[in-house]
């Protein structure tokens, strides 16, 4: 699927929902326009917030021959470029930012989604067989199965045999859920209903792994299961969400190749609203083709 197809899908789904189509961000230098002046090299400072946009745009190369080239390179990527060196070593600010980003990524793995937040969203909360974060990190197999209490809750409180079942799980990034939830779930549910699909009761799974959607789909009899789960964070990016969609999942027979994945959902990657529109179109195609993953015709 190329960019034009994605834009057409987003435009169609958003129009059917009666919402404005998000406009693409204008490039920094348009044809015929004068390029912006290069930003000066920022002096190292202990007072600088290492998580700020200013710190991310910092250029540590002293006395560059072409400062404008470095500025344009820095704008074009989130990679750690143009940080300069102090002899054979990284400069102090570059090292401190690396450590700060690593700490932020570690924090989002270890943090918990607050129970108050889940209640505020009006979501039913269930758990996998995991009881705490440490066990979640060391026993991924237990995160693939629902607890007995969760199974009973789903059978008693959720819509059975839906066309599409949407599930939210913390995964390996708490920030991915709390930061993107309001911009992806409401338009996703609205788009699915607008498409005339029977949507199940959305709920939150604490300590869930991707394969837990197979058991959920089997219990509820869902034709398509959509799991929104926090991705393993990278350095400096702790808010990335993934969508794993699967058709008619079964615990015993569904394999990873049966899933269709849309990753890198966040404001710096695929915008959540745009991702919601693409997921709606994906669910419709899965129901039409009665397949998912590598079994779908392109």
Swiss-Prot record:
It catalyses: ethanolamine = acetaldehyde + NH4(+). Binds between the large and small subunits. Keywords: Bacterial microcompartment, Cobalamin, Cobalt, Lyase. Signal peptide: none annotated. Its cofactor is adenosylcob(III)alamin. It is found in: Bacterial microcompartment. Its EC number is 4.3.1.7. It comes from the Bacteria. Its main location: other. Transmembrane segments: none annotated. Adenosylcob(III)alamin binds at residues 210, 231, 261. InterPro entries: EutC (IPR009246), EutC_C (IPR042251). One of its GO terms (biological process) is ethanolamine catabolic process. Pathway: Amine and polyamine degradation; ethanolamine degradation. GO terms for cellular component: ethanolamine ammonia-lyase complex; ethanolamine degradation polyhedral organelle. One of its GO terms (molecular function) is cobalamin binding. Belongs to the EutC family. Catalyzes the deamination of various vicinal amino-alcohols to oxo compounds. Allows this organism to utilize ethanolamine as the sole source of nitrogen and carbon in the presence of external vitamin B12. The basic unit is a heterodimer which dimerizes to form tetramers. The heterotetramers trimerize; 6 large subunits form a core ring with 6 small subunits projecting outwards. HAMAP family: EutC (MF_00601). This is Ethanolamine ammonia-lyase small subunit. The lineage of its organism: Bacteria, Pseudomonadati, Pseudomonadota, Gammaproteobacteria, Enterobacterales. The gene is eutC.
């Amino acid at each position: 699927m190329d960019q034009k197809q994605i834009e057409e899908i987003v435009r169609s789904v958003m129009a059917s929902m009666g919402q404005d189509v998000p406009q693409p961000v204008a490039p920094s230098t348009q044809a015929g326009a004068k390029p912006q002046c290069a930003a000066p090299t920022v002096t190292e400072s202990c007072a600088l917030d290492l998580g700020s946009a200013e710190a991310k745009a910092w250029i540590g190369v002293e006395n560059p021959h072409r400062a404008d080239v470095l500025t344009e390179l820095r704008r074009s990527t989130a990679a750690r470029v143009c940080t300069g060196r102090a002899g054979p070593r990284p400069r102090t600010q570059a090292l401190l930012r690396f450590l700060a980003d690593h700490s932020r990524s570690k924090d989002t793995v270890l943090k918990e989604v607050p129970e108050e937040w889940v209640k505020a969203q009006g979501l039913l909360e269930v758990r996998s067989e995991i009881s705490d974060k440490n066990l979640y990190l060391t026993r991924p197999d237990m995160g693939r199965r629902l607890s007995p209490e969760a199974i009973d809750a789903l059978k008693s409180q959720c819509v059975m045999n839906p066309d599409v079942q949407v599930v939210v799980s913390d995964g390996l990034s708490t920030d991915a859920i709390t930061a993107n939830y309001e911009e992806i779930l409401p338009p996703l549910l609205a788009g699915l209903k607008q498409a005339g699909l029977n949507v199940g009761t959305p709920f939150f799974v604490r300590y869930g792994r991707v394969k837990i959607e197979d058991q959920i789909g089997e219990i509820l009899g869902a034709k398509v299961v959509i799991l929104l789960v926090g991705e393993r964070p990278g350095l400096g990016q702790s808010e990335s969400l993934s969508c794993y969609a699967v058709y008619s999942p079964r615990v015993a027979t569904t394999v990873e190749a049966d899933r269709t994945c849309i990753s890198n959902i966040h404001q710096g990657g695929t915008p959540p609203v745009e991702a919601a529109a693409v997921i709606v179109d994906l669910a419709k195609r899965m129901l039409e083709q009665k397949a998912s993953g590598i079994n779908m015709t392109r």
